[in-house]
Amino acid sequence: NNDGETNNTPVEISGDKQTCMLIQRMKAFKAKDFTKELTGADPMTLIRNKIAGYYGQVWEKELMNIAQAVLAVAALSDHVLDLTKGTKTNIEAGTIYDAEQAALGDMAGGLGLMVMHSMIFKEYKKMEMVDYDKYVVNGVIQKEITLPTIAGKHVLVTDRFTATGAGTDAVYSTYLFGEGAFLSCDKNNYENQYTTNYDPEASAGIDKFYTKQGKVLHPNGLSLAVDQIAKESPTYAELGKSANYSLKFNTKNVKMGLIKSKVGTAVV
């Protein structure tokens, strides 16, 4: 109480620590001279031109693997809406709102991206819930792009990582992410990150291309149990194990959610 007599004694701010690890991945390619001579194509040039896309898929796979592990942590059970355990296993018009409110409560507006299977996207289209926002990308040539949104959230449609099982038994996972869900930092101090080598002896000549990338890709609000990681870089399996993560901050600070559902008759 600011009554002119009571001391305003500072209170120390307390908190916890997050532990993360650098994830390092590598890939090498090779092509025989014979292949180039036979086809007239240059496979190594093609590979070099596509290496950014290759690693883009690598990191996408790592991120989704971490997300599914984190959302299986018991302390984050409210962040998962599993419709497959109920009588109505399909999504409805209000499913998104139920999921984000259960996960973040009064901070539910913090989830702005949905990653879903094409079958689930189809169900939302049948409910006429899909809108499209137009954006102008400035560059050498101005280009207008259109991005889908559902309930004000941007949508990424991919059949990778978003379904298990098949047919009527298929379970679809729709992920919701908010800004700051992951902490990320690239490793930029590699020596010889991309290296070429030519072996003139083997198979009458082989071109080799060695690559490696490293990145911190950490779920914000949790800590990775580094004592459970066998080597200096965690494996895909280690990052995908929910027991290797522990909650460090309030659950509302974890900007992730998950909806598990099947495909049925959409209800509005």
Language-model segment annotations:
Residues N1, E60-M64, K215-S223:
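Intrinsically disordered or highly flexible coil/loop and linker segments, enriched in small
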Residues F34-D106, A243-Y245, K252, S261, ...:
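Alpha-helical scaffold segments that mediate packing/assembly in large oligomeric complexes
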Residues M26, T35, Q57, I120-K122, ...:
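Short loop/turn segments at secondary-structure transitions that flank enzyme active sites
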Residues I51, S118-I120, Q213:
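Short, flexible loop/turn elements at secondary-structure junctions
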Residues I23-T39, P43, I96-K126:
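Structured, hydrophobic secondary-structure cores that serve as assembly/anchoring elements
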Residues N1-R25:
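Assembly/oligomerization interface modules of large self-assembling protein complexes
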Residues Q24-K27, K50, D207-F209:
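Oligomerization/assembly interface segments of phage tail-like spikes and tubes
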Residues T84-G94, K125-V268:
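Sequence/fold signature of self-assembling virion shell proteins
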